[in-house]
Regions:
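The catalytic core of metal-dependent phosphodiesterases that act on cyclic dinucleotides
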Residues: 99-170
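Intrinsically disordered, low-complexity terminal regulatory regions
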Residues: 1-14, 50, 70-75, 90, ...
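Short acidic-capped amphipathic helix/loop micro-motif used as an active-site/signal-coupling element
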Residues: 35-38, 60, 64, 142
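Conserved protein-kinase N-lobe ATP-binding Lys motif
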Residues: 36, 47-50, 80-85
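Alpha-helix-loop-beta-strand connector modules within alpha/beta enzyme cores
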Residues: 180-181
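Catalytic core of bacterial c-di-GMP phosphodiesterases, primarily the EAL and HD-GYP domains
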Residues: 54-123
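A cross-family glycoside hydrolase active-site/sugar-binding cleft signature
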Residues: 13-15, 31, 77-81, 112-114, ...
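Active-site core of bacterial EAL-family cyclic-dinucleotide phosphodiesterase domains
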Residues: 1-46
Length: 181
């Protein structure tokens, strides 16, 4: 696939991801925002089946560009849409070029997906394997909120699992939630 016109612009905000035992920021999650300061919803509402691939590609490039411009020293975690990726080794080329252009080591890139849509587990496993082969880390975001189950943890072997907020809410006072976590 060649470059596609997206039809709208957006920027990134970087939210720290904390390693609690170490009590330090170890990465920054790149979150889409409107150029007018609006939230992710205003941007994501413009993503369609027709522009999903272009949006996914632009998110990766924009996250690296903005992190480099801002002097981010931690790893950058980039959300991706597995259903926008038709062939992992081909679809990652634009990201690799952006990383090289900005001297951003692939070891400082984490790709994470949210289980917001039905995903073919075999396809996702191929993506994870290719990304790991390149040197990226892979993560599941909002685990426990979507379509996947514990089997995905065993099969996908993510480097990082970010639990859904509703799963950990009141974990200190709820023995069942604590046991799950």
């Amino acid at each position: 696939r060649g470059p596609q016109k997206l039809g709208f612009d957006f920027t990134m905000a970087f939210q720290p991801i904390i390693d609690l035992p170490q009590r330090r920021v170890f990465a920054r999650e790149a979150l889409v925002r409107g150029t007018d300061g609006s939230g992710a919803g205003s941007v994501l509402s413009q993503v369609t089946t027709a522009n999903r691939y272009a949006f996914d590609q632009r998110c990766s490039v924009k996250a690296i560009e903005e992190a480099a411009r801002l002097g981010v020293e931690d790893a950058v975690s980039i959300n991706f849409m597995p259903n926008a990726i038709y062939e992992p080794s081909a679809c990652i080329r634009t990201t690799l070029l952006a990383a090289a252009r900005h001297n951003w080591p692939v070891e400082r890139i984490i790709f994470e997906f949210t289980e917001a849509e039905q995903i073919d587990p075999t396809h996702l496993q191929r993506i994870f394997e290719e990304y790991r082969r390149i040197g990226f880390k892979v993560a599941i975001d909002d685990f426990g909120a979507g379509f996947s189950g514990l089997r995905w943890l065993a099969d996908l072997k993510p480097d990082i699992v970010k639990l859904d907020l509703e799963l950990i809410r009141h974990v200190d006072a709820d023995p069942r939630r604590r046991a799950i976590v």
